[in-house]
């Protein structure tokens, strides 16, 4: 798989090349939300294009990360490390996080 930063750059450049938004961050979040909805609809209706819809979600997320100057690959790896260290358990019949998993805990 290509480097995350390169994918971010490509997603952003595609927006620029097509004259799409690269400055209105709230709009980008709304568009991302819409793509998540489309992916859910594809899944719930058992459509064969659910993978393509999930790719759209990823592309919007990569573009937004580039707009916000966030190294998404680094952040995903960091967050996955935190999630691995978290401990969960059932409290009153509901799964809950028992330990945060943050460094130093």
Label every PLM stretch briefly.
Residues 1-105:
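Flexible "arm" and connector segments at domain edges
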């Amino acid at each position: 798989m290509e480097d995350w930063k390169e994918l971010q750059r490509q997603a952003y450049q595609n927006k620029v090349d097509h004259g799409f938004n690269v400055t209105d961050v709230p709009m980008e979040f709304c568009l991302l939300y819409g793509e998540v909805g489309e992916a859910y609809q594809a899944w719930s209706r058992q459509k064969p294009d659910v993978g393509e819809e999930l790719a759209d979600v990823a592309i919007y997320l990569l573009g937004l990360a580039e707009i916000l100057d966030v190294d998404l690959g680094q952040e995903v790896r960091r967050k996955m490390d935190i999630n691995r260290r978290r401990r969960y358990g059932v409290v009153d019949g509901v799964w809950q996080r028992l330990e945060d998993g943050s460094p130093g805990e």
